[in-house]
């Protein structure tokens, strides 16, 4: 029996190590002259690019995307690393890919890969840039150098103006004429026209064009305001009155019941008086809209203020273009006897095409009356005036609007949504009624 000594153990360990080392050297030597069955190490970068491109693929049918990327990979790698079956497989995939592209109307991703990466998304960028190039109103931006001559108006004076101002102060009533710094206050008050502002003088919204005070928690409405308003209006020698208000999102119904009570008291004392109400959107509350529409008013007014593109730059975030149009449409559906009315400010960077599109949207929602006026910045803390629109352009919008079928349009640099509302509206209404009467007699 042989006994293994320590020296034999050492010798055996040495032999094993030598054989392992020789075997590894042989494999390395053979590998230098062998044909690779796998892609060389340099293709790892290509694989990374392929993976990135595949992640950016927007094709709905991902199976076809994978097929395309497999074809693309074979084209890049060549026949060397795919064996003798590469050519047949490539031709098959090419024919299938061509069929898929034909059924999809062409492969947009393949065309995109042919382009320089710098041009990827160029169409979308150009579309965005075309909108970005349009001017936008912004607080603090540079104003036009000089206000045109047609904006020069005399300071408010006159006996009627002073009497009306005293009555409003005595009854603790507010007017949008004063709060919004309307340039026509002297002219309107001297002919006995005023726009009474209900629900206080503090708004819960902060539109960037308006100078009315704002607060998230304004004072509660004055319970005596409907009575005082009705008393003042009945004492004035007027046949048309405009009631408006601040936005009161803090109230459950947005102040609709307060409006309705005021209208009821006015109509009780003077049923013949015509009432126009310029109201908020009530956050789309149908019950509030219904309450106002059935309150006895003749004209339901709500302003969209500007074109669709500029809404988020001009109005409070809680207001929007679609909701404003929907409110007017809904009021008309609830009470078809109502006249609906809206207003647009010009000079905020809108284009002619955008104004015409807004007019078409308004008319599509069966709105009867629209007014156009020039936006004037109340203070330096409000949006800048992008341009002063010429009187000729205001006339152009009026002509185009009448072609669209509006019942009446007031358009001019100094026109406001309530500016001479009774004069404009009554004149047009009387002319329409006269035309119907003459037609019936004929």
From Swiss-Prot:
Protein keywords: 4Fe-4S, Apicoplast, Iron, Iron-sulfur, Metal-binding, Plastid, S-adenosyl-L-methionine, Signal, Transferase
Localization per record: Plastid, Apicoplast
Regions crossing the membrane: none
SUPFAM superfamilies: Radical SAM enzymes (SSF102114)
The protein's required cofactors: [4Fe-4S] cluster
A molecular function GO annotation: metal ion binding
Domain of life: Eukaryota
Pathway involvement of the protein, from the record: Protein modification; protein lipoylation via endogenous pathway; protein N(6)-(lipoyl)lysine from octanoyl-[acyl-carrier-protein]: step 2/2
Record EC number: 2.8.1.8
Binding site for [4Fe-4S] cluster 1: 177, 182, 188, 418
Segment forming the signal sequence: 1-25
Disordered: region residues: 92-154
Family: Belongs to the radical SAM superfamily. Lipoyl synthase family.
Name of protein: Lipoyl synthase, apicoplast
Lineage summary: Eukaryota, Sar, Alveolata, Apicomplexa, Aconoidasida
Gene name for this UniProt entry: lipA
